[in-house]
Swiss-Prot record:
It comes from Xenopus tropicalis. The keyword Coiled coil applies. The keyword Cytoplasm applies. Its main location: cytoplasm. This is UBX domain-containing protein 1. It is found in: Cytoplasm.
Length: 287
């Protein structure tokens, strides 16, 4: 009778018959409170609504079951006070389990957030390391480029110095002074006869120096005097070394009239051969 009363009480409290039967079987029919505790604790079990397997008790006849059922049917319903008490107990258990579940979920969320932050910090560290490596590589590349540019300028300077030394050796260290012709006193003076006048052929004037003006990108200009036999590379080097604030990058040299863009091959040619003597205006243009 007690078992039947407990089962019906659980059903009256809103539990399904299958859950109520399973709770009583799991708690060994120890009463309504253990059954309610079990129901609240196993509320989220996936198999909570599956029918329980009931092992029939060994009995001499079926009369006992019939009597038990009759007894259940004859049981008086719970009083309002008993229902209220049991309902209150059930609500307290449900509230307690809900609180425990919320606390557990909160701890899980905190742990997940810790893991997320840890992974984010690790990812940020990896990204920062990659950026530092890329920056270091860029610095090394730029340092190597500057070193190569310096070596190239040094080679041009050395070549210019060798050319100057060679000219000094050839012309006896005359420097920028033009070669002096033999003194007129050493040539015997002869008076041409009126009948046979002497006509001297016109002589082409040779220039040993040339004045170069270079117009920069911003409209300003650089001016310098070079030897007529110096290479055009000397002019480019002069521009690179004297450009206010440094050259912004690779550039070409050209003349406007007649228009001519000088190539890398032209850089090895003397100014005299390029037609820039005795003076010329060169224009800087970006490559």
């Amino acid at each position: 009778m007690a078992e039947c009363s407990t089962l019906e009480s659980l059903i009256e409290m809103g539990f399904s018959p299958s859950r109520a039967e399973k709770a009583l079987a799991a708690t060994g029919n120890q009463g309504i409170e253990p059954a309610m505790d079990w129901l609240v604790e196993h509320e989220d079990d996936p198999d909570i609504d599956e029918p329980s397997v009931v092992v029939p008790e060994d009995s001499d006849s079926g009369t006992t079951d019939t009597q038990g059922m009759d007894t259940c049917e004859e049981r008086l319903p719970l009083t309002e006070e008993e229902k209220e008490k049991q309902t209150k107990r059930m609500m307290e258990l449900i509230a307690q389990k809900q609180k425990e579940r919320e606390e557990r979920e909160k701890r899980e969320r905190i742990e997940q957030e810790k893991q997320r932050r840890k992974q984010g910090q690790e990812l940020s560290a990896v990204k920062q390391k990659i950026q530092e490596q890329e920056m270091q590589k860029a610095v090394e590349d730029r340092r190597r480029e500057k070193q190569e540019e310096k070596l190239a300028r040094d080679r041009v300077r050395e070549k210019i110095a060798r050319d100057k030394a060679e000219r000094a050796r050839r012309f006896g260290g005359a420097g920028s002074e033009p070669i002096s012709p033999p003194a007129e006193a050493s040539i015997p003076a002869t008076t041409p006869s009126p009948s046979s006048p002497v006509q001297e052929p016109p002589t082409k004037k040779e220039y040993d120096q040339c004045r170069i003006q270079v117009r920069l990108l911003d409209g300003s200009a650089l001016s310098q005097t070079f030897r007529a036999r110096e290479q055009l590379a000397a002019v480019r080097l002069y521009v690179e070394l004297n450009w206010p604030g440094g050259a912004p990058g690779p550039f070409n040299l050209l003349t406007s009239f007649p228009r001519r863009v000088f190539t890398e091959e032209d850089m090895e040619k003397p100014l005299q051969e390029l037609g820039l003597v005795p003076s010329a205006v060169l224009i800087v243009a970006r490559k």
